[in-house]
Every structure is written in C-alpha cells, then in structure tokens.
Regions:
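Domain-level signal for soluble alpha/beta catalytic cores
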Residues: 1-473, 477-809
Length: 809
C-alpha cells in the first residue's frame, strides 16, 4: 500500500497490537528502555513488527512511543539515533507485506502549563524534534497515541504540521466516564484534532472493546461521515493479580464485531494484544467499508471540558473588553490578571456560555497581552473564548495558545482582511465571525450587508473553513444615532440565515448606547433578533432581563425541550422585590456554582476564591482575614473546607483535574500568606503529618504522583518526594531514617507491579511502623489488597482522604 492510497481503501485497515506486551513476553528487563532495543536488538523488534504484518496489520507502529528527550534522559543513544533505527526496523518488516511504517509518538511524560511546568512552545519544539527525526528516517505517517491532555496533543499536531507533510493519526485515551485523565470529552477531542489538521482520529488504550464502543460511536458523530476514525482497545482490563489482561483473542474479536456498524477507517489493539488478536480481526472486518453516511455537522465551540453546540440562543459574555471601561484599561496596563479573571468568573456564574476576550487598549502591547490573558482565563474557566481583535498578530498569538476549538472575532469584507485572517482560522481550526462591512464602511441597506456577508462566506469556504464554522455579524447600530437603520440589521440577519446557511451573531447592547433605561431597549432588540434567526448574542449575562428573554425564547421555540434549562434556572427564583429585601439583610455568602449549599460568614470570599482557582483573590482575602483571625483558624475554617468542596466536586465529576490543580494553586497562595504571618510572629508552621511518595523501581512515569504531592501539600502534609524509578532499599531507608508512618507508592505499567509488591514486602520485612497506600492506572482495589497495601487510592483526592483519616485531621 502506498501512502497516497491510505485513505482510499475499500476495507477497514488493520493496525497492529501491543509492542510492550510482546517485549514483556520476550523478557524485557525491569526498568529497561524499550526504544533502546531498536539499536541493541534490532532483530527482536523487526521480528515483532513482522509478526503483526503477517497477521494482517497494514499500518505498523515503529518502536518509538517513548522516544522523547525527557524519557530518554541518560540514554547512551540520541533521540535521532533511536528513531532512525526504529523506523528502519519497521520498514524492513513492512516491505514484504506492503504495510506502512508509522512514527509512533506518545506523551512527553510532563504536564504542560498551567497544570505543570512544561511551557507550551517547549512542548511544540520537543515534538518538532521527534517529527523531524521520523520524517528524515523515512516514516510513512505519524501516529500520535495515548494522549490524555488535549493541550499536549495540540502541541504535537502543530509540530507535525509545521515540520512535515506526513499524514497524521491522532488518538486519545479515555476513562470509563467518557473523559480523559484531564477531563477532555470525546467530542472536544474530535473537533479540535480535526481542526488542527489530523488526518484521522481515534481512541486507544485504557479500556477494552466493550467499554470503548460507546465513546467511539460518539467520536464518529462529532466528525463528518467521511472523516476517518479508528480504535485500538486494550485486551480488556488488567487482571487483579497483575498477570496481564482478562480478554482472550477470541473474546476480543467477538467484542469488536459491533464496531462494524461504525464503518471505521482502521482498527487494531493496544495493551495486552498480540498478533493472534490482530489475525482474528481479519474475519471481523472483512467486507467492512470505511466511511459513514453524511450527517449535518453542528456548529460547535469547545475547550477540553466544555463542548458548546450552538443550537438555540448562545450567550457570549461581553465584559472582558476595555472599551469605555477605565478600570479595565488600567488593569490591562498593569497586567492585573486577577481583575480580568474576576470578570470572567462573574460572567460564568451569571450564565454566559462563551466569553468574548478583547484586550485592545491605549498603552497596551496587544500581541503580547492576548496570549497571557487567554492562558490565564483557561486556567480558571472552562468556557470557550471568542478572541476579539483587529490586530492580526494578537489573534495569531492567542490562537496558538488556546486549548480547544477557538473562535475569532473578526474579519470583514475587505480583501486584505480576509487574506490575513482566514488562513489563521484554517491553521488553528477556528470558527470565524465575519462583519458585514467593507472598505466602504457600514452600508445602510440590508441587501448590501447581505452581499458583503456572501463574499465573506464564499472566501471562508474557499479557504477550507466549513460552513458550520462561519458566523455573520450584520452589525448593531445605535438607535440614538441611526434609528432608521435598526430594522435593516434585523432584516439582513434574517436574509443571511436563510440565503447563506450560516450562523449569526450580534453585539446586542450597542443598540441602546446613549439612551436611558438601556435594558428595555436591549431586551426588546434581542427578542427581535432572536426571532429573525440570531444564534449568538454578545451581551452582558448579568442583565437579568436579557437572560430571561433568552431562556424564555428557547422554551417558546422548542429549543429547550421540556423546559429543562428554564426550570433549572428559575424554579427557585423569588420575586425581585423579595430578593432585594433578602439581599439587604444577608451576610456575605459563597455559592457553589453546581447548585450546592451556600457558605456564609467571614470566610465565604476566601472559600470562593480557592474554589474558583483565583490565586490573587485568595492571597488578598487571606491577608484581610489575618488582620483579625489567627493563621490556623483561617486554615481550618476556610482553606481546608474549600479544598474539601473542590475535592467533592472532583469526585462527582462536576469539576476536573485542571480545576482541581488550580484550586490547589490558589490555596497555596493563601498558605504562603499564612506562613509569612506565622514567621512574623516567630512561630513554627506545624505539619499535619509526614508522607513519603515514590514511583516504584522500573517505572519512569510520575505525573500522577506529582499531582498527589500537590494536593497533599495543600492539605498541610509534609511530603518527601523520592521521585520515579525508586529502588526498594531507598524507600525502606527513607521511611526508617525520617521516621515516616505513611507511604504512597505509584506504578503505571503492569511490568512494574512486581516492583510495587517487592517494595511493600520490604517495608513489612523491615518491621517499620508505617501504612501504605498505592495508586496507578493499572492497579485495582483487589490487587492492592493482594500485595499487602493498606489502601488503594484511585486518585489524588482519595490520597488526601486517606492521609486525613490516618493522621486524624
């Protein structure tokens, strides 16, 4: 098969299975780098590839999954040498069978900012180095797999597109709840990866065929029918005794049969699968034609955790905009991100579904500030952002660091503007707002604005931007100055909707500028526009009149089925007059955004700041409280309860890892203020308990352990972090010498479960007075009990609960 024929096959292509599984069976030593075998034992690697090719695999992944600078640190061979050898081995095995050799690329092994310390552009450059090495070695395509962070996958996709012309298969790993480790949804992955230039998208690892199937079905619905989708499930789930996976090749083939109805581009296996698994897939997918019937693609905007389908009236919060706001302009000039974040959080709480982001102000370096604001916002709120600027460089800088499918506001009918903006939108997979204005200015007649909108639409389509990603703004003029042109906007909007088949958007509040009682005019104009076909309303979500109009309109037009959203928002509302009386008498409160009980009293503001991840607010509120309260009182009455609230939401699945880490970061900023106050009083800061953490011998994965460390430290525990690939004797010696009574051990690979068992046995044999909690992707509660652990910690929150229980705090 030639690369040019890759996506023209008349039958579902078979991928390969687990390389690690085969290497373990061949006696891979604990702690050895599998990728070094490309050079030290090429016959072994080539032989495994050949077995998969003989079984029917037509895309074979080279043994390069962990070939990154971070994971190869300390190796005797360079990244380029290992990749070149890996591709050469793979191509030799592929040649007799006409199979293609893929550069296999996995995660770097480090968390990206803001969840970790790896800068986005550093990640792009590291992936670029990998891609360049693979392309130079003659790889036929690139296979990104087992990603759990959409931001890291974006870095990888940009690196691939900017440094090669090879086809790209992109895959993420999802947990049983349908989200990745970092909270990314299946739909957000599919939409974002497709927009960034992936040639095909898929799901691999983590789960077996039965568990992955509903997610794979969702993925096929998130992309066009002719867009390639693939799967590589595990051989079921790990056995409780750590001896492998629980599905036989025959059962795997049986559980893969339902995938025929998805008309996949390709299918294979991941952990636990062997050439026999792949051989049996030949019969499963015989005669299965890739591609699904065409279906209408929704207009969507997304972040990893928040997927907004623009169906019904969607509210775009307008408050992150310095126009006419002196305090906002000052905040931008002073780089006061805390003020910007406060504006964002308040709009989220008011019900905005998208946030407009404009940082253009006098005295501001907009190209430098836009990416800073985008990153700051995305560290705290999960709503999609609309990047609002007339500065092309500012837009590109913001688009590059945006995590998800972005939204650009805007281009217009001027040829030079279209030429500058549309390629950016195409490169970064962004939706685009087209203003119905050109070099002649805003034309009063509706038909003239429609003509401009048509030119914009045609240009966008020609640039490769799909129709569902085109939004036309027919421009709201002020009724005070251009009253006779108000209806022209509504008429043009209606015509664009009907004639061009695009989405529509308006900055609603402009209508009332310069007139009294603005909410009356805004709400009435909004209602007129909605009836004419408005899709997105840029407005102030804190305007109760306007929000009520939106929710009511969605009910009356049957967009809000069974009035569920309306009921959720208004069922417990009280009349305005009563609400005012209650507000006047009420103490400060912190309301949880998920509808949980309000927290009142002097600590409410600090609790809210931690919950929302507002580091600046958390520090300021802590300083204010310390003027009246004792430091430990602030910890016990505010910080620990705040972390408990966040942890409870994390367990319920209403909040995800990035928010958990940002809340921990906000709590840390508060703790720093408390430490300073204690030091000024000449007192010591008492630890709530000392804990040793370690990733066991032979395992180089430490992301999970590092997250546990952050959470434990924010609960006031002292953590002795021994790092990764930690020898058994190091753990035992540290526990003895430091007099530690609680140990946390982590393992991510089935091959290192034996190391965990040996470490626990050594701790017991040394008769040390300590308890042990264990965690990691391959562990189960049953296996944890079997190897002598005292607790199984499924995540960081559970680790904190165990520590609190053990130390009695």
């Amino acid at each position: 098969m030639q690369v040019s024929e890759l996506f023209k096959q008349s039958n579902t292509i078979l991928l390969d299975g687990g390389m690690g599984t085969m290497l373990q069976a061949a006696g891979l030593k604990l702690g050895a780098r599998p990728e070094e075998l490309n050079i030290t034992d090429p016959q072994l690697i080539e032989g495994i590839h050949a077995q998969y090719a003989a079984a029917g695999s037509r895309i074979i992944n080279a043994n390069t999954f962990g070939a990154s600078a971070h994971k190869l640190a300390g190796s005797a061979y360079s990244l380029e040498e290992i990749i070149a050898a890996g591709i050469a081995n793979c191509k030799r095995a592929c040649a007799p069978y006409g199979a293609l050799a893929a550069l296999d690329v996995g995660p770097l092994g480090e968390l990206l900012e803001p969840n970790g310390t790896l800068a986005f552009e550093d990640a792009v450059e590291e992936y670029a180095r990998i891609v360049r090495a693979g392309a130079a070695a003659g790889a036929d395509l690139i296979f990104f797999e087992t990603f759990t962070d959409l931001y890291e996958l974006k870095a990888a996709l940009l690196a691939a597109r900017e440094n090669s012309s090879l086809p790209i298969l992109a895959s993420m790993s999802f947990e049983a709840g349908g989200r990745t480790f970092t909270g990314c949804t299946v739909e957000s992955f599919g939409v974002t990866a497709r927009g960034l230039g992936a040639s095909a998208v898929g799901i691999n690892c983590s789960l077996g065929p039965k568990e992955i199937f509903p997610m794979a079905k969702r993925l096929t619905e998130a992309v066009p029918g002719n867009f390639p989708v693939f799967v590589k499930p595990n051989a079921g789930l790990p056995r409780a005794d750590g001896s492998g996976y629980d599905i036989t090749p025959q059962l795997f083939a049986l559980e893969m049969k339902p995938y025929r109805e998805l008309n996949l581009f390709a299918a294979g296996g991941c952990c636990g699968t062997t050439p026999e698994f792949i051989r049996l897939l030949n019969g499963v997918f015989k005669g299965c034609v890739p591609g699904r019937p065409a279906h209408a693609m929704p207009s969507v905007l997304c972040t990893p955790m928040n997927y907004v389908n623009v169906d019904g009236i969607t509210v775009v919060g307008e408050r992150i905009n310095p126009t006419g706001k002196k305090r906002f302009q000052q905040a931008l000039r002073e780089n006061d991100m805390n003020y910007v974040l406060e504006q964002a959080v308040s709009q989220v709480e008011a019900g905005a579904q998208v946030l407009d982001v404009n940082v253009g102000a006098p005295g501001v370096d907009e190209p430098a500030l836009m990416p800073q604001v985008v990153k700051a916002l995305q560290s705290v709120v999960s709503l999609p952002l609309q990047l609002d600027s007339s500065n092309v460089q500012a837009l590109e800088n913001g688009l590059r660091v945006y995590n998800g499918k972005p939204f650009v506001n805007s281009t217009n009918g001027e040829p030079e503007k279209l030429k500058a903006i549309l390629p950016l939108c195409k490169k970064y997979g962004a939706a685009i707002v087209g203003l119905a204005i050109d070099e002649r200015g805003i034309l009063p007649a509706a038909e003239d604005r429609v003509a401009i909108a048509r030119r914009i639409t045609e240009a966008a389509l020609e640039a490769g931007i799909p129709r569902e990603d085109i939004y036309i703004d027919c421009l709201t003029l002020t009724a005070s100055a251009q009253q006779k042109d108000v209806l022209a906007t509504v008429q043009a909007l209606e015509a664009c909707k009907k004639e061009l088949g695009v989405r529509t958007i308006l900055g609603v509040s402009n209508i009332s500028f310069g007139l009294p009682c603005r909410p009356y005019l805004n709400t009435t104009f909004l209602t007129m526009a909605m009836y004419a076909g408005l899709d997105l309303a840029i407005m102030n979500p804190s305007s109760e009149e306007m929000m009520a109009a939106v929710y009511a309109y969605n009910v009356l037009t049957n967009r809000d089925e069974q009035s569920m959203q309306y009921i959720e928002r208004y069922a417990n509302r009280v009349p305005a007059s009563t609400a005012l009386k209650q507000a006047a008498q009420a103490a400060p409160t912190a309301a949880a955004s998920d509808g949980s009980a309000e927290i009142s009293g002097p600590y409410a503001a600090l609790i809210k700041a931690v919950e929302k991840g507002l580091k600046g607010d958390a520090a300021a509120q802590t300083r204010a409280l310390l003027a009246e309260k004792q430091p430990l009182e602030v910890v016990d009455e505010a910080l620990i309860p705040a972390l408990d609230i966040v942890g409870a939401k994390y367990e319920k699945g209403t909040l995800f890892l990035p928010q958990l880490l940002q809340a921990a970061s906000a709590a840390q900023s508060a703790f720093e203020e408390i430490k300073t106050a204690i030091a000024q009083k000449g007192e010591g800061s008492a630890s709530k308990g000392r804990i040793v953490l370690a990733t066991v011998k032979g395992d180089v994965h430490d992301i999970g352990k590092n997250i546990v460390k952050v959470i434990l430290e924010n609960y006031g525990f002292e953590v002795i972090d021994l790092g990764r690939d930690v020898p058994v004797e190091t753990v035992v010696d540290t526990v003895r010498e430091k007099d530690v009574h609680l140990v946390g051990l982590s393992a991510l690979m089935t091959t290192t479960l034996k190391s965990m068992e040996e470490t626990i046995a050594a701790l017991h044999a040394a008769q040390l007075d300590c308890k042990i909690m264990v965690g990691g992707a391959v562990l189960t509660p049953e296996y944890a009990e079997k190897i002598g652990a005292d607790w199984y910690a499924k995540d960081a929150k559970r680790s904190a609960d165990i520590a609190k229980e053990f130390f009695g705090v």
